[in-house]
Amino acid sequence: MSSLIKEIEEAWQIKDKLFQDSSKLITLKKTLNDIIESLNQGTIRVCEKKENSWEVNEWVKKAILLYFITTESQLYNNNYNSWYDKVAPKFSADTDKNIFKEAAIRKVPGAVVRTGTYIAKNVVIMPSFINIGAYIDEGTMIDTWATIGSCAQIGKNCHISGGTGIGGVLEPLQAKPVIIEDNCFIGARSEIAEGVIVEEGAVISMGVFIGSSTKIIYRDTGEIIYGRIPAYSVVVPGVLPAKEAGKPGLYCVVIIKQVDKATRAKVSINDLLR
């Protein structure tokens, strides 16, 4: 792995001169294709949790960006659409059906998944868009018209509801993508962006918008936090009243309750939100 990282780092330093040496470019393209395939298989990830902290593998982001630089756009076709892109689809008409059967993946018409994404077992993909570098773990549902940004990380047994936007990020290199940990529910038409981390078991109501500067308020205590939804929190949209009379309030999100793991497993989402 260290030699692979070294090759990417060296190529990154001369990314503006890559086309000046054709033999090195051929070697680099093979390496980049291998990395993209490793992303497809989930053996390499853009972001990993180590000792309770999420860390970005910047060299993987660099590899993806180098892949864009060194790959020419081409025309792609399927039975009902055509497009012109540098990034191939992960699945095509030539994909062996046994790949889907063995992994128990269900992908319906209108779902766009770019290569360089990991789709684990028992994932259901409704008409949606999943960008390069994303990681979708086992048993998760990506519902209709959801968008999963580049490098976003989605955990096990999550439900990403219809029309939801999960932000990704390739640049700046050190920036984390949005991370949705295991067993989370993200309500319809919500938007989670700018590297926000939604910790395990959290429930996000419909129509909640969270970025890095969004105030996240504990209703019981008034404490304000940013950039992180604590584990097993139940979150709804809210308004923080202005201190001065007659001034407009500002949007915020409110943690209305926190439940333990056992309660989260037993109680329906609708009951938690009520």
From Swiss-Prot:
Gene3D superfamilies: Hexapeptide repeat proteins (2.160.10.10), Tetrahydrodipicolinate-N-succinyltransferase, N-terminal domain (1.10.166.10). Substrate binds at residues 106, 143. Its EC number is 2.3.1.117. InterPro entries: DapD_Trfase_Hexpep_rpt_fam (IPR005664), Hexapep (IPR001451), THP_succinylTrfase_dom1 (IPR023180), THP_succinylTrfase_N_sf (IPR037133), Trans_hexapeptide_repeat (IPR050179), Trimer_LpxA-like_sf (IPR011004). Keywords: Acyltransferase, Amino-acid biosynthesis, Cytoplasm, Diaminopimelate biosynthesis, Lysine biosynthesis, Repeat, Transferase. GO terms for cellular component: cytoplasm. The keyword Transferase applies. Pfam families: Hexapep (PF00132), Hexapep_2 (PF14602), THDPS_N_2 (PF14805). It is found in: Cytoplasm. GO terms for biological process: diaminopimelate biosynthetic process; lysine biosynthetic process via diaminopimelate. GO terms for molecular function: 2,3,4,5-tetrahydropyridine-2,6-dicarboxylate N-succinyltransferase activity. Pathway: Amino-acid biosynthesis; L-lysine biosynthesis via DAP pathway; LL-2,6-diaminopimelate from (S)-tetrahydrodipicolinate (succinylase route): step 1/3. It catalyses: (S)-2,3,4,5-tetrahydrodipicolinate + succinyl-CoA + H2O = (S)-2-succinylamino-6-oxoheptanedioate + CoA. Belongs to the transferase hexapeptide repeat family. PANTHER family: 2,3,4,5-TETRAHYDROPYRIDINE-2,6-DICARBOXYLATE N-ACETYLTRANSFERASE, ACETYLTRANSFERASE. This is 2,3,4,5-tetrahydropyridine-2,6-dicarboxylate N-succinyltransferase. It comes from Rickettsia felis (strain ATCC VR-1525 / URRWXCal2). The gene is dapD.
